[in-house]
Amino acid sequence: MMTHWPSPAKLNLFLYITGQRADGYHTLQTLFQFLDYGDTLHIEPRRDGEIHLLTPVTGVENEDNLIVRAARLLMKVASESGRLPAGSGADISIEKRLPMGGGLGGGSSNAATVLVALNHLWQCGLSIDELTTLGLTLGADVPVFVRGHAAFAEGVGEILTPVNPPEKWYLVAHPGVSIPTPVIFKDPQLPRNTPKRSIDTLLKCEFSNDCEVIARKRFREVDAALSWLLEYAPSRLTGTGACVFAEFDTESCARQVLEQAPEWLNAFVAKGVNLSPLHRELL
């Protein structure tokens, strides 16, 4: 029985904000790709119906943690539909590698891994579509991790079209700050009217991120990290930050630059992959 479950990072290879809805949510067009790097969840089934998170996150109550919320949500929905075996529970711990507030999707990925893993371990039998619907109630980025394939996303991020962008090597750098998403989306100078384009058109254009100008303006650490990376390769912000990344055609090129990273920059090299490491384990 599989007990170690990948919870990979994602990059937004581009991100354009096309509008803002009446409810305040922003509409966007973005390209998600996974990394062969991320957190690992250790999940051991229990038979007493209890959910225990054995590795609490500092400053976050266990019941507010997306890991616990995802487990309880699956338990509730599967139980209500008669698909939860009696006594289903779990002990969950996490090896955390992805920073909070980094734009790598760590929390969303954790939630998706819990949904997929417990659906498998508990033998609930929910479909990917059902798990995706549950995931969306936990966060806009959760569905892409549930589905497990690189995707072009529209709407608020929930309308997904599978795509296969080139699987490049990336140097990903965390500049030592955490950026809450609302800080970027509430900034009055954030571009909110980028014209919508087809995926075919977008893939032919130079990639960029509408959030980057705000992140660089408000966080000098992000600006410094991007300024350094841009000396070596095409680089940009992922999500709303704070992580930034540079793309390379080979691992050796990426690692050569990594060796020159300044001490204040926490960085790693990873491969972009179109099939999530989580789903690769299930094949």
From Swiss-Prot:
Protein name: 4-diphosphocytidyl-2-C-methyl-D-erythritol kinase
Pathway the protein contributes to: Isoprenoid biosynthesis; isopentenyl diphosphate biosynthesis via DXP pathway; isopentenyl diphosphate from 1-deoxy-D-xylulose 5-phosphate: step 3/6
Pfam family, one: GHMP_kinases_C
Assembly and binders: Homodimer.
Species in which this protein is naturally found: Salmonella gallinarum (strain 287/91 / NCTC 13346)
EC number: 2.7.1.148
Domain of life: Bacteria
This protein's record includes keyword Ligase: no
Residues at which ATP binds: 99-109
Family the UniProt entry places it in: Belongs to the GHMP kinase family. IspE subfamily.
